[in-house]
Amino acid sequence: QHSPVEPELRLIPHPVLWKKESGTCDLSHGFCLPQTPPAEIQKLIHAFSSLINRYAFKDTLSSAGVTIHFENLQQKVKDEAYELEIKEESVSIRASAYNGFFYALISLLQLKESGDGIIPCGRIEDSPRFSWRGQHLDCARHYYEVDSILRLLDLMSFLKLNRFHWHLIDDEAFRLELSSVPELAARTGMRGHGCTIPGVFGGSKGPTGGTYSAEDVSRIIEHASSLGISVMPEIEIPAHSLALLKVIPEMRDPEDKSFEVSVQGYSENTIN
């Protein structure tokens, strides 16, 4: 059970354990991360610093700020667990893996931003209640630019979400560019008048859509990894396969004379 919410501790989600102590820590001038960190912390600091800079959080990272100490607990706690000890002059972060250290920094950022830089001293022990904390995005029915997806991943990281469920294939499009079957994305990535896929779900005013190259996918996966997020690409078959069958109709049994209509109004959109 999580401890009851206290007004002076504004964290989402609320930690498993919060033990308040006397005094406050002044983070109004930011906090100072190690300049020569151990190898396992270096990637973390780069990812967190980049995240801070992308959203222009003022007075967050400063050599004049409160010193942050990192301690690796060497598998003594779960990978996503962390301990945060807040003193008046310093903050200690303890964890066993990348995600734990990252979530501790996110918690510290939340506390700083919600408390105008002044946060209570105390000890936080936290670990996720759920191993899968996900966000789903349907890019088959509506195409999202890569930069929009990267921004979504950033926002997920602020809430300590760790799974990106990426829906890429459906009746309306086959978004992945495959070198083995390039015509799949080339013919179904755009929909509208005169296209292989008709104008539905916002595609009626003209061809709309797009595809994701191997480079796009690699960029998204790498960005997600730096934020402690795993990517789960979803390719939907054998149902919801209209786009696939428009390009490779032989994947449907020609002897099958059944006529089914999906909820969305598509017929003969299953592989059999």
Positions of predicted regions on the chain:
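Feature activates predominantly on carbohydrate-active enzymes
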Residues: 75-268, 272
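Acidic, contiguous N-terminal accessory segments
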Residues: 1-133
